[in-house]
């Protein structure tokens, strides 16, 4: 297999591409040769991500999209394919979290988490899948979380949504394998992004978090991006339906 990690000639759409893991993944896919449609709610930040890809010699477009609005997802896919070509790679990264005592979680809270973390993911997949099936190839990377495997107090909605992502990933993988489409889940642990970084600034919290991670550090967004490039590349063509934990060993620690 020549250049197994090259994405030359491929087009990717990345949701939640304005910052953190999503932005790092978008930049890495662009560096690997893919044209990238960067999607997020905040236009300024997502335009910045697209501009960074283009400044490095790649092709990119930015689209302001609320992924909980199905019509906006469909429009973004149509515009991206018109500008960059058929979508070969979908990275479902957009998501929100909620920490709250379960008895205080309102219906609106619950619906908001599930709408963003699960329903929007399904709609994005549904929007790009017909083209992938017709072409006989495609890569779908659903960004989950170690919280989909762990029982974490005060995170009932978030844990449930991410566990559902695992199930969705396996079902899609089983259904579409014969069409040359691989569907996998990238499940990060604590990463060096805004919320964990702020928590690490408090000495007591830092010690508590690091004590749960055998590697004794946070993961870096660039590490998640490197894994995403692998999952998007021909090197992973025989891998599908898997949830890959990038968590410094936290989910296997006793």
What are these regions (language model features)?
Residues 125, 161, 169:
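Active-site helix of classical SDR
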Residues 145:
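Residue(s) in the substrate-gating loop at a strand-loop-helix junction
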Residues 130, 174-178, 237:
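Alpha-helical segment proximal to the catalytic Tyr-Lys
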Residues 2-4, 150, 229, 240-254:
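Short C-terminal tail/terminal secondary-structure segment
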Residues 101-102, 106-114, 209:
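Substrate-binding pocket helix/loop in short-chain dehydrogenase/reductase
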Residues 11, 18-19:
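Conserved glycine-rich cofactor-binding loop
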Residues 34-48:
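Conserved glycine-rich Rossmann-like NAD(P)H-binding loop of the short-chain dehydrogenase/reductase
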């Amino acid at each position: 297999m020549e250049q197994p990690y090259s994405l030359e000639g491929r087009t990717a759409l990345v949701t939640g591409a304005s910052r953190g893991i999503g932005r790092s993944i978008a930049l890495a896919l662009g560096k690997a040769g893919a044209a990238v449609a960067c999607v997020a709610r905040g236009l300024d930040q997502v335009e910045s991500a697209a501009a960074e890809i283009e400044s490095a010699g790649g092709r990119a477009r930015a689209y302001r999209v609320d992924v909980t609005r199905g019509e906006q997802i469909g429009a973004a896919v149509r515009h991206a394919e018109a500008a960059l070509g058929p979508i070969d790679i979908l990275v479902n990264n957009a998501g929100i979290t909620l920490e709250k005592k379960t008895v205080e979680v309102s219906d609106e809270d619950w619906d908001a988490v599930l709408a963003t973390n699960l329903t929007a993911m399904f709609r994005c997949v549904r929007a790009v899948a017909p083209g992938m099936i017709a072409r006989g190839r495609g890569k779908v990377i659903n960004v989950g979380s170690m919280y989909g495997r762990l029982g974490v107090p005060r995170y009932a909605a978030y844990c449930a949504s991410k566990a559902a992502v695992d199930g969705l990933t396996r079902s899609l993988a089983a259904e579409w394998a014969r069409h040359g489409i691989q569907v996998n889940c990238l499940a990060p642990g604590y990463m060096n992004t805004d919320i964990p970084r702020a928590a690490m600034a408090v000495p007591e919290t830092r010690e508590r978090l690091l004590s749960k991670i055998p590697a004794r550090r946070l993961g870096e967004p660039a590490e998640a991006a490197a894994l995403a490039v692998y999952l998007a590349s021909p090197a992973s063509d025989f891998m599908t339906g898997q949830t890959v934990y990038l968590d410094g060993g936290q989910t296997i620690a006793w």
